[in-house]
Amino acid sequence: DRSWAQFTIRKEAKWHDGQPITVDDVIWSLNTLKEFGHPFYRFYYGDVSSAIKISSDTVKFEFSDSTNRELPLIVGQMPILPKHYWDDKDFTLTTLEPPLSSGPYRIKNFEPGRFITLERVEDYWGINLPVNIGTNNFDNIRIDYYRDETVIREALKSGDIDYREENQAKAWALDYDTPAVAQGRLKKVNLRHYNPTGMQAFVYNTRRPIFQDPRVRKALAYAFDFEWTNKNLFFGQYTRTRSFFSNSDLASRDLPTGLELKILEKYKNKIPESIFTTPYQPPATDSLGWPRDNLTVAQELLKEAGWTINDMTLTNSDGEQLFTFEILLYSEGFERIVLPFARNLKKLGIDVRVRRVDQTQYINRVRNFDYDMIVSGWGSSESPGNEQFGHWSSSAADSPAASNYAGVRDPVIDELISGLVQAKSREELVANTRALDRLLLSGHYVIPQWHLTSQRILYWDKFGLPKITPKSGTSTNLWWF
């Protein structure tokens, strides 16, 4: 009846100190992650009511919601922590002592902020499992950390590092015109993948009064000129994102039909009529850099919402409140992307400030929802589930460190998340996810940015790669010398 799932621990499973992985470790891990772990775990394992020791090698998980068909898989993926290692330690404290683990690699040495070296565990207990055959082929893997992206690229070109996945379009287009690349000694490869690419966007904090009117949020999207940005800053490499589940069959498209339409019609009096009449499309331009028509539309929407321009300044109807907000960043590379957007906003009379802070301050502010707008995103998979509560549910809107960055509070969205979690078939999952996608898009909680359906990788010609690239893309875990 799906109210429980039982697992038997493999007899050969052991920690790196030689002690066996036990049922006690499993139970302790669940309770610790829910109580002291990242808030994500409280949502993810929220329907796991208990873990019970059945025998020395068997554990039973009981579920409070038997309609969540994914729960057995979710608990099957749970990180298992060594109880005996943590018994005399405070799990909530930061430490530089490498924790005990049980995987194919362990930490060999490290220097905080500079590098970490992993060494292969020769007697790794799972080495002969079918899932691991052909993987974990390197004796040592060193991961270097850099503060400056330019220095990383120079380190790669000089041979100090062996592999990099490039994340900047400008660098991919201009920074690797070298003899090593031309001669094929340094491989520069664009590998197609079929992973859902999720949503990267300018994210409104709707907890702020200034962003609580969806007409305002919709208006500001007309100031972002993706076509100009893609042409002039990204060398035409990106595709505009039109869904929170982009690059997958979960993305909403055209108008709702079939089961999706049936689901949405239940909420016909509670959701925008446009969902049934107009497919979502982000504003587009001619890429010439002066989106006059779009800014006119934005101005009209702002006027509908009670904002008008007086002396080149956008104010409310009483002329007492200025429209001003801050875009919070931590990446220097994003400033050149955000500044043209900010210039267009200023043409609407909006006083927008672009502020870049260090990563630690940025993380703390985001965790406490202390921002007006950020650039952020949500990953996606082919099987969305419990994690969607953390992204969009009303209960997550005020949960510190949750991923509901936009502050979404909508009872219909809450119900649609429950619908996709409880889906009994792929058809139901797709229909509920597409319906959720439409609600999120129609709410204008974000200004969608762009995505890439390939991996831009560079590596020195010393590696062997599988002849067939997995649909999910390549991974150095599958490579060899």
Q: What role is predicted for each listed range?
A:
Residues 75-135, 139-140, 147-151, 158, ...:
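Gly/Pro-rich hinge or "lid" segments in bacterial periplasmic/extracellular proteins
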Residues 4-7, 26-30, 59-61, 103-106, ...:
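Short, well-ordered beta-strand elements
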Residues 111-116, 223-282, 295-299, 332-343, ...:
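Detector for C-terminal structural segments
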Residues 1-39, 54, 60-62, 146, ...:
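Aromatic- and charge-enriched surface segment that lines or borders ligand/interaction sites
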Residues 8, 14, 42-86, 104-111, ...:
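Surface-exposed binding/hinge segments that line
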Residues 50-53, 108-119, 144-208, 215, ...:
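Extracellular/periplasmic solute-recognition and catalytic clefts
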Residues 6, 10, 93-96, 124-177, ...:
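Ligand-site clamp/hinge motif
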Residues 1, 19, 41, 66, ...:
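A structural "hinge/loop" feature
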